[in-house]
Amino acid sequence: LAQAFVMKPAVLESKLASVGTEPAEDKVVIALGQTDGTFAYTSTANNGFWCEANGNVGNWGDTAPVYVEFSGLTMTYGHRKGVSVAGQKYMLKPTLIYTRNGVQYKATIVLNMQF
């Protein structure tokens, strides 16, 4: 990711805003790509996102089987037993967005999960 944004890892981490922050100049924010091409920024998990089966942001409960969470640049992901369906595939698109001189640069991580 540091190479994608042309910066050293320590610099990237120093520019990282907390999950829930909207894009801002000279900051790297974490968002969740939605199926309609937009991004969700509001955290619904522990510094991350609970996700619906289609990969869109959701809330913890009976309709959000998977999640992705962040601690700095460390990403954790998993599923909620009893809500996730054995054998079903889930795709999440956590995205880091860096804004510089008013231009947004995006690095998308595609998580394909199956339990």
Provide a role label for each language-model segment.
Residues 56-57, 97, 112:
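Residue-level detector of solvent-exposed, low-hydrophobicity positions
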Residues 73, 94, 115:
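Functionally constrained cores in energy, signaling, and assembly domains
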